Regions:
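PLD/PLD-like phosphodiesterase catalytic module centered on the HKD motif
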Residues: 1-27, 39-40, 53-58, 63-203
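A short, well-structured juxtamembrane/interface segment
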Residues: 35-43
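DNA replication sliding-clamp ring fold and its partner-interaction surfaces
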Residues: 42-52
Length: 203
């Protein structure tokens, strides 16, 4: 994915620090969104770059700051599409938060679809079909503030094109999704379409 010396150096430094249980203090200008650290800030800045389109593939949506930046994108005319997995792999309180925030995004004008069959573990944002952010962070507070996570900004045209193609394939096989009311019971189709696995959790 990368041969950028600064990024490779940061990844190696992080591994060494975690291995030795030493503090890790990355610098922001390498294009890596580290958690704990400045990942939330970098993700927000990435969303703010969108002028035409923002494609999102995330299983969880429990972070109000990200919601605010996506709503701002819609207000400035950006087409926002969200691919999620419905309740699959979500547990309370993330299930309630995700349903509520997906509903707000839908009401604001975003297109929300539910993937069918296998879900992706990697989390993806694509801006204007020109740049991507690919990594491990869910949109929730533990992923940003408590766990070691990382995402990478990608600008290589061939890589972004491949990621966009995969997103479009997943979008074409998905269906329009209207999340249930957060404190209500999910519809039967939530179970019938793809059996909920109680042992699976998007961490």
């Amino acid at each position: 994915m990368t041969n950028d010396p600064a990024q490779v150096e940061q990844v190696q430094k992080c591994f060494d620090c975690d291995w030795n249980r030493e503090p890790f203090h990355p610098h922001e200008d390498a294009g890596l969104a580290w958690s704990p650290g400045y990942a939330r800030h970098l993700v927000c800045k990435f969303i703010d770059r969108a002028h035409k389109s923002l494609d999102v593939q995330h299983p969880k949506f429990a972070e109000p700051v990200i919601l605010e930046r996506m709503l701002a994108a819609i207000q400035r005319g950006v087409r926002v599409r969200i691919l999620c997995g419905g309740k699959h792999g979500l547990h309370q309180p993330d299930l309630m938060y995700s349903f509520a925030l997906w509903r707000l995004m839908h009401q604001a004008g975003a297109k929300v679809h539910k993937q069918k069959n296998l879900r992706a573990h990697a989390k993806l944002l694509v801006v204007d079909h020109k740049q991507a952010l690919l990594g491990s962070q869910n949109f929730d507070q533990p992923a940003f503030d408590l766990r070691r996570e990382v995402a990478m900004e990608l600008y290589d045209a061939a890589i972004v094109r491949d990621l966009t193609t995969m997103y479009e394939c997943d979008w074409e096989t998905s269906r329009k999704y209207e999340p249930p009311y957060p404190v209500g019971e999910p519809a039967e189709e939530e179970e019938d379409e793809f059996m909920h696995d109680a042992t699976l959790m998007h961490e």
